[in-house]
Regions:
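Beta/alpha (TIM)-barrel catalytic core signal, keyed to glycine-rich beta->alpha loops juxtaposed to Asp/Glu
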Residues: 1-137, 142
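Short coil/turn segments at secondary-structure boundaries
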Residues: 147-151
């Protein structure tokens, strides 16, 4: 099942991931780097875009998908954990996915062979339980119609 799933968007954990696990369907998450946020492309907020892509029209798309006070603090934690393991933030974001049950092959977008090689190497990264908790604890579910009083 190709689902939207990463450290700053984990809504699939509510229903879809458990359903897929119970029926034997593997997960192939798209946007594992949250359009560059988890790779460190927007340090300090959306105005801090560091690449041509994150400064251009992609910024508006990214802001539309990822909003909330938790987004950039989570990204900062990814950067911290990356430094601890001597890895890139992108590797840590993908390694986190490989620690989640059912995830077999995140769908990544790269522009250079070296980026792909780094992300493939993330398969080998073993994150400590306390680091997984540290990465996950700031997440806040996205408001949806049910959570704001519509039914």
């Amino acid at each position: 099942m190709q689902n939207h799933y990463n450290l700053v968007y984990r809504e699939e954990e509510r229903e879809m991931n458990p359903y897929c696990l119970s029926t034997g369907v593997d997960l192939t998450p798209w946007s594992p780097l949250a359009r560059g946020i988890l790779a460190g492309s927007y340090q300090g907020g959306f105005s801090g875009g560091s690449t041509d892509r994150s400064k251009g029209q992609d910024r508006q798309r990214t802001e539309g998908l990822y909003h909330g006070d938790h987004v950039f603090p989570i990204a900062e934690r990814v950067i911290e954990i990356a430094a601890k393991y001597d890895k890139t933030p992108a590797q840590i974001a993908v390694a986190w996915l490989f620690h989640k049950p059912g995830v077999t092959s995140p769908v990544v977008g790269v522009s250079k062979v070296a980026q792909l090689e780094q992300l493939v190497a993330a398969v080998e990264i073993q994150l400590a339980e306390e680091d997984l908790y540290y990465l996950e604890e700031l997440y806040r579910p996205v408001d949806n119609l049910l959570s704001i009083g519509f039914s």
